[in-house]
Curated annotation (Swiss-Prot):
Name recorded for this polypeptide: Genome polyprotein
Binding site for ATP: 484-491
Pfam family, any one: VPg
Key words, A-Z: ATP-binding, Covalent protein-RNA linkage, Eukaryotic host gene expression shutoff by virus, Eukaryotic host translation shutoff by virus, Host endoplasmic reticulum, Host gene expression shutoff by virus, Host membrane, Host-virus interaction, Hydrolase, Membrane, Nucleotide-binding, Nucleotidyltransferase, Phosphoprotein, Protease, RNA-directed RNA polymerase, Thiol protease, Transferase, Viral RNA replication
Amino acid sequence: MSQTLSFVLKTHSVRKDFVHSVKRTLQRRRDLQYLYNKLSRPIRAEACPSCASYDVCPNCTSGSIPDDGSSKGQIPSWEDVTKTSTYSLLLSEDTSDELHPDDLVNVAAHIRKALSTQSHPANVDMCKEQLTSLLVMAEAMLPQRSRSTLPLHQKYVAARLEWREKFFSKPLDFLLEKIGTSRDILQITAVWKIIIEKACYCKSYGEHWFEAAKQKLREIKSYEHNTLKPLIGAFIDGLRLMTIDNPNPMGFLPKLIGLIKPLNLAMIIDNHENTLSGWVITLTAIMELYNITECTIDVITSIITGFYDKIGKATKFYSQIKALFTGFRSEDVANSFWYMAAAILCYLITGLIPNNGRLSKIKACLAGATTLVSGIVATQKLAAMFATWNSESIVNELSARTVAISELNNPTTTSDTDSVERLLELAKILHEEIKIHTLNPIMQSYNPILRNLMSTLDGVITSCNKRKAIAKKRPVPVCYILTGPPGCGKTTAALALAKKLSDQEPSVINLDVDHHDTYTGNEVCIVDEFDSSDKVDYANFVIGMVNSAPMVLNCDMLENKGKLFTSKYIIMTSNSETPVKPSSRRAGAFYRRVTIIDVANPLAESHKRARPGTSVPRSCYKKNFSHLSLAKRGAECWCKEYVLDPKGLQHQSIKAPPPTFLNIDSLAQTMKQDFTLKNMAFEAENGHSEHRYGFVCQQGEVETVRRLLNAVRTRLNATFTVCVGSEASSSIGCTAHVLTPDEPFNGKKYVVSRCNEASLSALEGNCVQSALGVCMSTKDLTHLCHFIRGKIVNDSVRLDELPANQHVVTVNSVFDLAWALRRHLTLAGQFQAIRAAYDVLTAPDKVPAMLRHWMDETSFSDEHVVTQFVTPGGIVILESCGGARIWALGHNVIRAGGVTATPTGGCIRFMGLSAQTMPWSEIFRELFSLLGRIWSSIKVSTLVLTALGMYASRFRPKSEAKGKTKSKVGPYRGRGVALTDDEYDEWREHNATRKLDLSVEDFLMLRHRAALGADDADAVKFRSWWNSRSRLADDYEDVTVIGKGGVKHEKIRTNTLRAVDRGYDVSFAEESGPGTKFHKNAIGSVTDVCGEHKGYCVHMGHGVYATVAHVAKGDSFFLGERIFDLKTNGEFCCFRSTKILPSAAPFFPGKPTRDPWGSPVATEWKPKPYTTTSGKIVGCFATTSTETHPGDCGLPYIDDNGRVTGLHTGSGGPKTPSAKLVVPYVHIDMKTKSVTAQKYDVTKPDISYKGLICKQLDEIRIIPKGTRLHVSPAHTEDFEECSHQPASLGSGDPRCPKSLTAIVVDSLKPYCDKVEGPPHDILHRVQKMLIDHLSGFVPVNISSETSMLSAFHKLNHDTSCGPYLGGRKKDHMTNGEPDKPLLDLLSAKWKLATQGIALPHEYTIGLKDELRPVEKVAEGKRRMIWGCDVGVATVCAAAFKGVSDAITANHQYGPVQVGINMDSPSVEALHQRIKSAAKVYAVDYSKWDSTQSPRVSAASIDILRYFSDRSPIVDSAANTLKSPPIAIFNGVAVKVSSGLPSGMPLTSVINSLNHCLYVGCAILQSLEARGVPVTWNLFSTFDMMTYGDDGVYMFPMMFASVSDQIFANLSAYGLKPTRVDKSVGSIEPIDPESVVFLKRTITRTPQGIRGLLDRSSIIRQFYYIKGENSDDWKTPPKSIDPTSRGQQLWNACLYASQHGVEFYNKIYKLAQKAVEYEELHLEPPTYHSALEHYNNQFNGVEARSDQIDSSGMTALHCDVFEV
């Protein structure tokens, strides 16, 4: 393959050599050939794209070659071509000899023919797929600009474009499937190009494209890697285990023979016939032989038929394959069975049916396999061929990906910066993947090709970096111009100044030339005589250089295209005092950017005056440049005397300030300071640099401190770099700066108090602080000395640079590696450690390469750790501290550092899963080696077999303890336990702190489990103790002790190493631990006859209690009274008691999410029988982090809605405390006579009603029809001009014939869909944050209402009574008090609520009678009304009205705006909050009510419950509202799955709290997805205003930067966020001066901040009137209330006055017309009068007289009009 590839690539490159060598001798031949071709070639419609690349085009001459490759005319046959020296040289590596031009053209012509004709003999050795793959590979290896020289390149590009157009609109799954199944390299390349293109534009197509591209670029899937090799490896492992590793191989041999049945198998194969029926018979006989007929008989026919169909559809290209499988004769081969097996194996490995050439090679290998030895050799040859062909497929796949990425690297495809950055990241991923393949020993022969692919990707990476750099700002350079007469020494001074500014040689730019390829980009740039040429626009050139915008230089060389100007200091020289005339348009911009130094040489000038005409002697010039006079002009001085006029009029009107005289040193210092000051704003944003340390000393001590720091670096083998001054140099670690007191520095500073050479002796013992005399913590010292920037892989090793080993680990298993790596990782890096461990398990022989690849993506801890890994693949040394360095060695290198003995390498078997990384030759060699060992073991004597058995028995486990030690008494139990000093201290401190008596083995095992992330209680507590110990590790001080022994320095601890009691978790970073039990008021204790506690029970209501059977068995008492009426169902049981607890808990048959103390629960919730100390119990296994104790049985496990789903019945004890056994809730009928009416009867069967699953009711309540809205008499003719009309009236309405029932059903369907909402842990954390935020202004323990009538009078009496009583509340009241039916209903519900029992959560459904937009009327869209039960509303008002009022009373400060008056100064407070934010987002939501998650609503109700007094009334209200709502209409009852009914009590407050929780969850999830751990209260760092689904979010810049992800998370929760105006598009920040909230535009008017009501809402007040109920809404009402109607129009005029005079005049005309036609006694106010009235009411000067708060009359925001 590599030889043929060299031919393809060398075809063009070699042509340049031989064309020049034979140009003269072949001139006449070329002329004749061109003439002949011109006469003989047929006319073509378009020119051949390859003609320009050849002397004689092979595309055009190939047409005269026959399909069989024979000779016809002047081109020789293929057989003759292969005999030429040119063909031989092409296939060899020696290309020093010249290639004959004619032969080269003939070879190219035949290759062209072979690509177009499958029967050409060249295809015998290579199939068309291979030839095409070679050309694609050549494309990938060449730069994109050189690919046009390849054969068929344009054709392949066109093919890929056609595939792109065909597949571009396909989904991602389809494209990924195509990559795995397609065998067309052009199609695969096109698919990769589509995936990568959409990944680069993932903002438009979705982030999943980018994530999928990153994942798939790292994967190369093949059948042989994933299935075939592991299968064969497992077979070899099993064979070894049963033979070589079997202590009794002789006993196994008969079983092996009986299992394989070799004689029967040989007879079946010998009688095989190569026909379709023969293959069916042979395969069926083999299946019968091994008893697998039944499991495969259904697929045998389809397998054989499918394979032959594929062969039959093959073209003539596969002629030999057809002949092989359809008609092999005896003279060709004795039996084709093995050929068929080899062909199938070749297909599985390479993915292609073997072509003629490959089958010929297979046939040649198998033809001579007549003996055992020759068969083994043939098998090895086949394995080598298969490995080579498989490697070819891998290289082809990498080539396709490289071509796709390289073709996307152009500005027309990846145009914006984001797409370039993503393309850069993908190119780096593929580059690293190819680099990993270069480390694979199987791919060593393909390393030249892989390196070329990496070179192509390097070009892409470089190009992307250039394109990124062009789009970014750069530091503004400093430009100084040295002006003066010729010969004064300006240029020499400029060069000397450049040396003082930088150690680098200066770059030089000459403006007389228009290209700058010689520019090197060094820190200092010199432009000599920049204004010498009048043809150059040097003013604009200088302005472009001294700018923050990138400056692209004009370069001629292709590799320099895109070169940027990057120098920091620019030194120019000029002979002109005024380089740019002040009258120039660019003079201001020019002089603002440059500083001019007037240079004079007084000695030279005096010599010229005294001796004119003589040369200036050398004595007039000094080495220290003291002969020069350097005068620095003031800012914008265009000459020595004047400054530019800012107005650009009189440039000689402003005198220049006196100059500042400098020397060469002070000038260099001034330029450095100017550069620092000019770019200070960019450095200030970076903040304090934590990797820079400054050591401040006096000027005379600088060199001594530098030597001391270098000695420290050498002594500790540190990674930091020592620098003198504040300028830093490149370093792999921190930088230590030696500073003087007056130097500015951005980093940590330490004052050196002891500085002398004698301090070097103090370095012994690592006393660095004492040697330098600095007060520096050990943590900072460790960070300074050992911090590593990034991840570094070292291929070359120097022993003096290796760090001292702290740990040496022999990798005998995966767990050794995982346990050692945990020392290097942060907690966030544990997942990467597990992945690395799995990779090592699957490929242990590639440990160094895998560690090298794994290290690039993991995060390391700040502790300094050095570990040496002894692996079968070599030695790996890993050093980490923030970053990491790794050395991969092929030999043992163990240095001092506590290692007492050199460990021996581990022995990891290379088979099983690791077989996928081994070449086929090694797999078959392992197989034959195993067979040889088995054979030798059988032939040898019994003594050898006995010895083998004795040898195998060595590895059996031995007893470790006898006698007194067998019970593991004593701390050092077991054998082989060795602890380091640090581990010993940890063990002692852990036992002492936690008051435990753990052995060393148990301690190490506990630490191991905790490191791997176990969630049992012991592991969780150990991690907490470890974190606390780590935080206190540095709590010590250096003290001086003066005693009898003299003066000595010691370190004493300021705090003990013990775990810290965190108390209440205010970090919000993790779930809180065990806390208060759920349903505390509903839990009671079950005792025995003596009063001893046995367990717990939970009150279900009405004196019925639930517990577990083993607690209730025997004589059991509850509150001193014997229980009765005990019923059991398995382990779950119920009983009755006359003692009733103050509250009750709801029960539900579902899966729990929390244990009794609030900790998360992990369970599959599948009941199984378990053996316990109380017998066999059927329950569900669960794990929690809470430790339980005997007597906790019966405590409740709850779901997200607070419903009890199971009871605790057992735990795993001290050994496995996290294991819990939970008895699920099952229904037990404990009912007596019902005490309350309930519509929804669970005992009735489910029915389907218009697509809804519901229960049928005994009574039918129809949906009210008609409307009370009528057209005003003033607009009977023009009412259609109004944008709104009354909502659809049902099937008889011509505007929309949709029935009211259909409207209700369509509205209810979204409520029946399940909405998950945010993740459990995220919601729980945000709930804690919101409670903590509200606690600042909402008191706790707010008392609930104890009077039923007082609670009832808090309700709105104009609303429905609900499903149990018809009409409105005020219809059932006499003299302000409820009548008997209403009072009886309230009393029944109140009685249950006082016992804490949840009430039926049922609503009656109606449709809102309101004005709707005309387009929504046509669609039949109406809003539903959920009529809540008056009893439930009364109980909820008693429970939560006080909490709700406390929240709404603080709307000016909190996030909930319920209760705000938008026509009062409150709107000014809102405006103040809005304008103080960095970014403001106004958001509305579609279908808000139906998309609410029940878990979020339950969390909001729990917030209300948190601030209440937790009375039984509160328990009843909370449990009622958290239960699923039931909608009742048309005689059916529907239980909904999600959503929040609009008629739910306190719906506005609950909706607003839901809104806060949703936004908080979205922000938290977005930040932590970006790697930002949220340990603070989010609601304290941003502001928001919510009123139901209306929201305004005031985000800081950190939140605004992830706003797209925040709104994406909200959509993922099931919500539908939209813009306020409902327009299509992403939600963007809005102008804070015009925010829309609650249909009001908060803006500034001449009268101040006002909330302007929508104009259309004001206008439609004049078109419609509320009157009697009717279906004829176009007819005016029979009677009009002049008082309420007049007040309504008066208010409309007041609101209109805030929109200005022009709009008010329009409203004034409508008001006059309404007064005239409606016969009202009203005089509409003038504009100024209306304005005055509104402002007086706004400021509270005038009492309001409108009906805005009266729901029974026509007001601007009542249910009649949509505001």
